[in-house]
């Protein structure tokens, strides 16, 4: 019997699925006219006569003619109908049309292309086909984004044993969760560095786990089932690297694949629930205490000096909002106005003004608000005694409100600034000392400084500025003890001021010391002479600047002149 040979069209799209690739579906639907090369066409035609050369000649002429024409002159590489077919397949894949509607849409598109066949139509079809290819390529790139990490992970898993001594279900479930982590999370990578494999995650900061050391640490713990009281002692066997791996894998695990009875299942469940809750109950101190007991440290008092103890047992108090009622605020304004008027009109001290205000209150008004009035008056008395400036500002300010210390009883008044004149008996001491120092520095010359330093018994400023400033500061701070010396110093300064001459007095004395020059008087004759015609022989009465007399005498009216 002759063996029948079936014709199989070669396919070059093995990397993609036909159901997800419209171009591949179109290529497979038009495979005989698209992807057959010259040699493939000759082989296909000649295979029809293989074994029986008369078989090809016995076929209908139309079939033979089409096969020969296709083998000799193949069709265009990307004909129009294949572009339309690609678009129809993409529409079906995206759900725009149903599969049974594809033939009608394909036929309508072919008719429209044949009716409006032009360069624009071909370019539009080419652009649409390019968009389909780009979308498919992007989908493939997204799906295969972690191919490198998956390859490295598979290489690492190939080195692990397929079976473990106990806890095979937990072991298999953990490996599945690790694969799911690497494949689903975009910012997770697996790479090899030397003999070790590393898992790096960048979800909340960069975190790197040594997979080789972590699985080596987990090797004896896969099937361990520890009671509740013994879990703390077993937790000491886990390294921080292994705990980080369990924390990263825990969101992808469940209670079915990994049993909660095992110790690792208990930890994964704890991590998974902790990551799923936004608010955690702070039981860190209890956990640290239990760990300390498990390690053999029975003295719990040593843990009270740690920062963890201080933060855990710190009592958080919400600040209380203190405010006055409208009635209390009216009482405060009334007392402010009354005290300020007593101080300004009657010139009373703060304490006296408060006492007079309290004594003149109406009995019924005081009885109805006794507690608040006593509290307010006590606060004002304390402020007047401790901080008079603060008391004056509180009384004079029409918008003043009591601070928090008024309600709590913890009075915190601002400290009063210490000025230089606080140590003096009166303001005259400071004024007299300042005036004396200023006059000595400005009006005493060098001879008088030398004379006063050698004769006078009272201290005078030195010639240097430094000693003068030092003595001035000492005189300001230390009050005078000897009044006689003060009076004598004032008399000396008065005598020196009497001998001091101003510029005006010096000018007058210099003018008086000069000899007096007497000029002869010139008498003008009644008859004018015209000997010279230059006009300068006779002094002009309007340009008379020298000599004695009134220069404006010519402007004075003359008596006895008749009009």
From Swiss-Prot:
Q: Which UniProt keywords apply?
A: Capsid decoration protein, Capsid protein, Host nucleus, Late protein, Phosphoprotein, Viral genome packaging, Viral release from host cell, Virion
Task: Please give the residues making up the propeptide in this record.
Answer: 549-563
Q: Which residue ranges does the record annotate as region Disordered?
A: 449-471, 524-543
Site (Cleavage): residue numbering on this chain: 548-549
Residues recorded as bearing Phosphoserine in the entry: 235, 452, 456, 475, 486
Principal subcellular localization = virion
Chain segments carrying region Binding to hexon-linking protein? 148-261
Task: Please give an example of a GO cellular component term from this record.
Answer: host cell nucleus
Instruction: Kindly list the places in or outside the cell where this protein is found, as annotated in its UniProt entry.
Output: Virion; Host nucleus
**How does it get modified after it is made?**
Cleaved near the C-terminus by the viral protease during virion maturation to form the mature protein.
Induction per UniProt is: Expressed in the late phase of the viral replicative cycle.
Q: Which InterPro entries match?
A: Hex_IIIa, Hex_IIIa_N
Q: Which residues carry this modification: Phosphothreonine?
A: 284
What family does this belong to?
A: Belongs to the adenoviridae hexon-linking protein IIIa family.
* Function according to Swiss-Prot or TrEMBL: Structural component of the virion that acts as a cement protein on the capsid exterior which mediates the interactions between the hexons, including the peripentonal hexons, and reaches all the way to the penton vertices. Two hexon linking proteins IIIa, one from each facet, stabilize the unique edge interface between a pair of facets. As the virus enters the host cell, hexon linking proteins IIIa are shed concomitant with virion acidification in the endosome.
Additional information = All late proteins expressed from the major late promoter are produced by alternative splicing and alternative polyadenylation of the same gene giving rise to non-overlapping ORFs. A leader sequence is present in the N-terminus of all these mRNAs and is recognized by the viral shutoff protein to provide expression although conventional translation via ribosome scanning from the cap has been shut off in the host cell.
Subunit info? Interacts with hexon proteins; this interaction tethers the peripentonal hexons to hexons situated in the facet. Interacts with the penton protein (via N-terminus). Interacts with packaging protein 3; this interaction is required to promote correct genome packaging.
Q: What is this protein called?
A: Pre-hexon-linking protein IIIa
């Amino acid at each position: 019997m002759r063996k029948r040979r079936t014709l199989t069209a070669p396919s070059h799209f093995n990397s993609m699925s036909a159901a997800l690739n419209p171009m591949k579906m179109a290529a497979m639907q038009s495979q005989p006219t698209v992807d057959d090369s010259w040699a493939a066409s000759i082989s296909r035609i000649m295979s029809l006569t293989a074994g029986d050369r008369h078989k090809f000649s016995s076929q209908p002429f139309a079939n033979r003619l089409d096969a020969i024409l296709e083998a000799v002159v193949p069709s265009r590489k990307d004909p129009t109908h294949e572009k339309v077919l690609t678009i129809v397949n993409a529409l079906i894949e995206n759900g725009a049309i149903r599969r049974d509607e594809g033939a009608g849409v394909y036929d309508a598109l072919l008719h429209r292309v044949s009716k409006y066949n032009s360069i624009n139509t071909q370019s539009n079809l080419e652009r649409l086909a390019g968009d389909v290819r780009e979308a498919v390529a992007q989908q493939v790139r997204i799906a295969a984004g972690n191919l490198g990490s998956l390859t490295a992970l598979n290489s690492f898993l190939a080195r692990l044993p397929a079976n473990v001594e106990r806890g095979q279900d937990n072991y298999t479930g953990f490996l599945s969760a690790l694969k799911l982590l690497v494949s689903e999370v975009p910012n997770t990578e697996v790479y090899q560095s030397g003999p070790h494999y590393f898992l790096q995650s960048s979800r909340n900061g960069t975190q790197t786990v040594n997979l080789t050391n972590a699985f080596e640490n987990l090797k004896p713990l896969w099937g361990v089932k520890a009671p509740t009281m013994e879990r703390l002692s077993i937790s000491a066997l886990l390294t921080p690297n292994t705990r980080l791996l369990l924390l990263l894998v825990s969101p992808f695990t469940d209670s079915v694949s990994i049993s909660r009875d095992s110790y690792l299942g208990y930890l994964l469940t704890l991590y998974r629930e902790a990551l799923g809750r936004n608010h955690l109950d702070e039981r860190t101190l209890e956990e640290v205490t239990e760990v300390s007991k498990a390690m053999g440290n029975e003295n719990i008092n040593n843990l009270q000096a740690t920062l963890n103890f201080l933060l855990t047992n710190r009592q958080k108090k919400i600040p209380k909002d203190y405010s006055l009622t409208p009635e209390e605020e009216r009482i405060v304004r009334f007392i402010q106005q009354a005290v300020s008027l007593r101080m300004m009109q009657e010139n009373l001290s703060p304490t006296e003004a408060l006492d007079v205000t309290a004594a003149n209150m109406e009995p019924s008004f005081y009885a109805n608000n006794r507690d608040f009035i006593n509290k307010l008056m006590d606060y004002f008395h304390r402020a007047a005694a401790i901080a008079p400036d603060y008391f004056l500002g509180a009384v004079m300010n029409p918008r003043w409100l009591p601070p928090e210390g008024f309600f709590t009883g913890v009075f915190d008044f601002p400290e009063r600034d210490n000025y230089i004149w606080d140590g003096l008996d009166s303001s005259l001491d400071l004024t007299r000392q300042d005036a004396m120092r200023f006059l000595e520095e400005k009006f005493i010359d060098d001879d008088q400084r030398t004379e006063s330093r050698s004769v006078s018994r009272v201290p005078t400023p030195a010639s240097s500025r430094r000693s003068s400033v030092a003595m001035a500061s000492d005189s300001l701070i230390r009050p005078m003890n000897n009044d006689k010396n003060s009076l004598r110093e004032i008399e000396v300064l008065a005598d020196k001021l009497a001998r001091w001459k101003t510029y005006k007095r010096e000018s007058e004395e210099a003018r008086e010391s000069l000899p007096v020059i007497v000029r002869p008087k010139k008498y003008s004759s009644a008859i004018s002479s015209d000997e010279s015609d230059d006009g300068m022989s006779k002094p002009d009465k309007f340009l008379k600047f020298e000599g004695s007399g009134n220069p404006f005498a010519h402007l004075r009216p003359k008596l006895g002149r008749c009009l």
